[in-house]
């Protein structure tokens, strides 16, 4: 669909990215937070550093319209997986988000023989694209005991809610579930 709009995708690894492309990627990243009233916590310096030190593990999927950069998906590559993390665009185009964030990631994994593609957190819309909910964990330590207890209490409640949400989302799976 994006080809019909004369949009082309250009995949650039961190070590190949020019200063201009790094600045563009950071700008697209920040624009998403600006639109959603969030705070883009990753600086341009961070982007420069990961491109310098992580090289081929940083994968930018730039979208171009008439040689103008209009969007970018920012992914990170592990030994056998590609992890979608950030996205941003100048203007909305039909199917552009899914092309850059999902279809290009899938194609990249096939080309590079990566076994796993994690398109990123959140998004019930990912079910229709074939991505089922996956439970993840994280570990954190809070020095303040009262704050720690409040977070623990919240996490206990959240765990049940997340279990129920995953169950509901799995019922929407486009795949036939074996019994």
Region annotations inferred by a language model:
Residues 47-49, 68, 103-105, 117, ...:
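Residue-level detector of functional hotspots within protein domains
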